A protein has these predicted regions:
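Ribonuclease/tRNase effector modules and their secretory precursors
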Residues: 1-96
Length: 96
């Protein structure tokens, strides 16, 4: 299932990054590294997101929604999936 609006407001997700309340899955770190991004570079992409980068919201578990963004970076287009529970989790970060 998916919906057309972000589950978490983008400003809230970006504030969590700035407050250090963020972590990443291993696969997202690996995908970022394949594109030339270290963790700080991935965070820079998240803080630069705009509403226009939003693609969809989906969930694998009906209690955990994931917001999907598709920003364009100097390294190319990124498929970026975020979820917020207690902190921001970068679930997916890979070349589109």
């Amino acid at each position: 299932m998916e919906k057309g609006l972000p589950h978490c407001k983008l400003a809230v997700a970006q504030a969590m990054v700035k407050a250090g309340k963020v972590r990443s899955t291993f696969s997202a770190l690996a995908g970022g590294a394949e594109m030339g991004f270290d963790f700080d570079g991935m965070l820079a992409v998240v803080t630069a997101l705009t509403a226009a980068d939003f693609c969809m919201t989906s969930h694998a578990d009906h209690q955990v929604w994931q917001d999907v963004y598709r920003p364009t970076t100097p390294a190319g287009e990124v498929y970026l999936k975020l979820t917020v529970i207690d902190e921001l989790l970068i679930v997916s970060f890979k070349e589109l």
